[in-house]
Amino acid sequence: MFAKFDMLEEEARALVRKVGNAVDPIYGFSTTSCQIYDTAWAAMISKEEHGDKVWLFPESFKYLLEKQGEDGSWERHPRSKTVGVLNTAAACLALLRHVKNPLQLQDIAAQDIELRIQRGLRSLEEQLIAWDDVLDTNHIGVEMIVPALLDYLQAEDENVDFEFESHSLLMQMYKEKMARFSPESLYRARPSSALHNLEALIGKLDFDKVGHHLYNGSMMASPSSTAAFLMHASPWSHEAEAYLRHVFEAGTGKGSGGFPGTYPTTYFELNWVLSTLMKSGFTLSDLECDELSSIANTIAEGFECDHGVIGFAPRAVDVDDTAKGLLTLTLLGMDEGVSPAPMIAMFEAKDHFLTFLGERDPSFTSNCHVLLSLLHRTDLLQYLPQIRKTTTFLCEAWWACDGQIKDKWHLSHLYPTMLMVQAFAEILLKSAEGEPLHDAFDAATLSRVSICVFQACLRTLLAQSQDGSWHGQPEASCYAVLTLAESGRLVLLQALQPQIAAAMEKAADVMQAGRWSCSDHDCDWTSKTAYRVDLVAAAYRLAAMKASSNLTFTVDDNVSKRSNGFQQLVGRTDLFSGVPAWELQASFLESALFVPLLRNHRLDVFDRDDIKVSKDHYLDMIPFTWVGCNNRSRTYVSTSFLFDMMIISMLGYQIDEFFEAEAAPAFAQCIGQLHQVVDKVVDEVIDEVVDKVVGKVVGKVVGKVVDERVDSPTHEAIAICNIEASLRRFVDHVLHHQHVLHASQQEQDILWRELRAFLHAHVVQMADNSTLAPPGRTFFDWVRTTAADHVACAYSFAFACCITSATIGQGQSMFATVNELYLVQAAARHMTTMCRMCNDIGSVDRDFIEANINSVHFPEFSTLSLVADKKKALARLAAYEKSCLTHTLDQFENEVLQSPRVSSAASGDFRTRKVAVVRFFADVTDFYDQLYILRDLSSSLKHVGT
């Protein structure tokens, strides 16, 4: 099935030898790529030699000149604007200092440097104006470094003064950091992660008081931080100079002047190379060589020296390298004498593990590493609390993520995806009958974990390019292959095994050495900027090839070809008729994983089992309407958004059942009173929200109640009170949802209004049903108002906008201008009108039996004698509304994208994302409409005698 990869074991063994022989006894080693940022700091070091002041690394200055781009920038990154900002700012600073003091570099024309500075500063200004990923990319120390660089630039040239939208957010981050950190804390003996960024503290720190933190000449293995120390400490540190000279020669720059951003990365590379190879299927005998033992000893000694934990280098401890080191020693069978206990004691927090002490926000991949290290231990049950904690954290992070998962240590979403699948695959395999974690997790948690794995696998499959790679990136493609290989082990993904096998076969050619060509675009590991690690990349290539060559499938043809009536129905819709059969089936399989979770909530609001209605088959259908459209459009809204909307969809069906089966009989003689009940309930819940006393308002109804003012309540009185209680639970669920409470006031106001209209429309329809035609109203008026309000579309859309405002928008208003708001409300009205029309097309027969008002009952349709002709006429009107919706959405998108970007804590470009969410909701609405035309999806009332 797969291309035959010869000599893999020999290549892997050769890589182990290369890694083992790279370790310098004093300085360790690093194969991380050169970075402009650190090179610029090295270029700014000057020294007195024989009475003359000289640049210590003149080659580094020349390196900067060689690397400047045509647009004046230095090494911008396609996935991180922060990288370009840092590189360009640091390089401009170096050029400004050199043009003032050329020292021994007299052969470089000052005029040329000045022109380069002008181009560089112009580029920096443009980059700062466009900088919108300061939070998303989350580079180490960015909140400290960029403000410092801008100050340094202004000190060199008073005309430098940048204004940019994200400046306020950056300074807010800076203030929050400084509130938690005192530079004077570095004078103490205990090392701090801030030692990695001393260049951001010039003028705020007495560098003479931090020299005791030097280890083998470096400040926490950072050339830029060490350069700042060497420049500002007195006396001159020969130890620091020796370290930098070693990095200059032994680093990946090899004397060219380029400096890596971190040196050494000894433990990082040793652990990543070995664990990556062994996790993919290489055995100890495959890798056996003298260097293997020496590597294991080096790792074990690192644990001993740093008291049970390690870092990427000595005395730079973190949870990633500690967990990876534990995993490596376990896989080597040499974990005697090391334990997770020190890691847990140092890095465990309330609901996750810290990467390092003082961390601003948690890392997804760090917690993946912790979980993997614990799951591979023979005594894993001893660490069950930590296993549960990290599993919950990762699951919640995946479910909450809008779009692809992100992590601050890597710019490719494929890397954290791979790690999560590796960890969660172990969870699922070890939770099987007879396995050690069989009773460790409840069914709901395992369902959530399964959804994470399934989504990760499917989205990886869907993202593969025609050439077999992922985004044209060799290393990221290896992550994808390893994700698929791990997924292929699970029964959960059995139906997708043919697609997994085909994708891995297609990727095989990319991984062949002849096509393995990394570029700057493969610099996806992040620290202060971004970098590549040559030996780690080589390990991932071999691991992906090994995993592909080892994978065998036992495909059950019955599973892969299985279909059902609903799936066949979906394939007939315009929206899904062009979707490949396997992709459609995959979305059905993903949807099925949500069904048990949805059923857990079916009685949260309404006691549906006590209502005389047919079985709620729609529960099996609802998840697909959201999952299928999400996968089809590749929108990838958050899984939590999907599930919240599934529940709202379920409640939409249940509220229809409730009004028809319970409210209508109870209020048959007093419909006007039901309007009063609706207003009372909605007003009371809104008051609670406004007053922020949720759950504490006197008189709140939470269950079945009776009116205590009635001495001997009648059956009718009890029924009326219970209906009010049910309505209260429904309104509570919607308006007290955590994301609704954190949405902008504009979105909450719209939801309040639409929810009230929705409930009143049900009451109005109760009255209309008694005559099968509302007197004195035209069809046009009715279908755009009461009828449209009666379907759940408008309030569900408002609910979705609240979620988007609270999560992606961080509380921003979804629609910032009057034009945006008008157009989106117009789109919502077209959606609701179209939805009602299509609903009525599908329910003509049921509405006749149950005496429900339907569009075709209006006099305007009386000229058509056949029901089929009436349906066709209504379908043409629905098509007109859809064309209006399409046009309005296009106008809305144009309006949004022309509006200014709002600087806030919102991640990414909120403008483009909110357009995607609105279009996604419109797709789901359109899909429901297409289904309604093909089949009536609602439950039927059970009449007496049936």
Curated annotation (Swiss-Prot):
UniProt entry tagged with the keyword Zinc: no
Pathway assigned to this chain's UniProt record: Plant hormone biosynthesis; gibberellin biosynthesis
Residues annotated to bind Mg(2+) 2: D656, E660
Record keyword Ribosomal protein present: no
Origin: domain of life: Eukaryota
Motif (DEXXE motif): 656-660
Binding site for Mg(2+) 1: D656, E660
EC numbers, comma separated: 4.2.3.19, 5.5.1.13
A single GO molecular function term of this UniProt record: ent-copalyl diphosphate synthase activity
InterPro entries in the cross-refs: Ent-kaurene_synthase_fun, Isoprenoid_synthase_dom_sf, Terpene_synthase-like, Terpenoid_cyclase/PrenylTrfase
SUPFAM superfamilies found in the cross-reference section: Terpenoid cyclases/Protein prenyltransferases (SSF48239)
UniProt keyword terms in alphabetical order: Isomerase, Lyase, Magnesium, Metal-binding
Chemical reaction(s) catalysed: ent-copalyl diphosphate = ent-kaur-16-ene + diphosphate; (2E,6E,10E)-geranylgeranyl diphosphate = ent-copalyl diphosphate
Gene3D superfamilies attached to this UniProt entry: 1.50.10.160, 1.50.10.20, Farnesyl Diphosphate Synthase
Note on domains (UniProt): The Asp-Asp-Xaa-Xaa-Asp/Glu (DDXXD/E) motif is important for the catalytic activity, presumably through binding to Mg(2+).
Family assignment from sequence similarity: Belongs to the terpene synthase family.
Protein's job: Catalyzes the conversion of geranylgeranyl diphosphate to the gibberellin precursor ent-kaurene diphosphate in a two step process.
Name of the protein described by the UniProt record: Ent-kaur-16-ene synthase
Organism: Phaeosphaeria sp. (strain L487)
